């Protein structure tokens, strides 16, 4: 059994808090309404940039923590039920509580099929990645270190360094399954080659802030936001640095290990279509009416409130799922699908 890394568990929670910051600034309307050139504009965009690598880091973790254990397909079925809960059940409950919410029958029906309808882009992309992980893992686990270094450099150059300006491989600036696959491979290869092993944590932190400041400086001075992208080499570098730093931490993880699995639910909670488009949309513009120190405090305060709200809702969901025995249903679905796939595979003989 693979030993649990509590540093990575802690990172998952930090990354989700960073995502909450991104959504407070972005969907909350702070960035779009800050006056260009003001201190508020500069500070909030810097906060955005240092948090932007969170999504990349999540996918990198999946590869970095690559396991020799057999993939459990029940995990993806459980995840589908989780996504269904946040897409349809939460929307249905909100509609019942507030009948004036502008949501039609067709929209509710689309929420019943969240993966097919790409309700949560990351989850649709992750489902695709999950399906091909069994194909990727045998090679990623066995590849020799020298070969892994060559592939790591090649993937970084082709899909990030060269691609972020023109995106010839249709990664849609990172909002796609193909980018998650690349990140998964990069994470696994980084672990194999022991990336930055010789560098001190302090050095990595300096690299992180230099990368962030460079991205921020280019945007502020040249109004060029090309580097503020999931496929940007500097954002990717930041994501990798965080994974490496936190993987080094030696922690007693009793509390962390209980909270870490709740992180995905926090993301799904705030990305629920109604919450995203009605309750978060431009809700935090008023922050800009205060002095910069209060503005910063309010950004972190509202990000914390979103984080805690999602944490509580996810905890309730887990208890509800335990009550209705979703785990057993997932087992039966996996068993049924396995039989169907086995029978279909016989047709290929």
Regions found by a protein language model. Give the residues of each.
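Loop-centered beta-sheet repeat module
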Residues: 147-194
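Solvent-exposed interhelical
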Residues: 131-157, 189-207
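Alpha-helical transmembrane segments of multi-pass integral membrane proteins
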Residues: 96, 220-325, 342-345
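Structural signal for the C-terminal ends of transmembrane alpha-helices
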Residues: 64-71, 135-143, 164-165, 186-196, ...
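Transmembrane alpha-helical segments and their boundary/interface "anchor" motifs
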Residues: 15, 40-41, 45-62, 66-120, ...
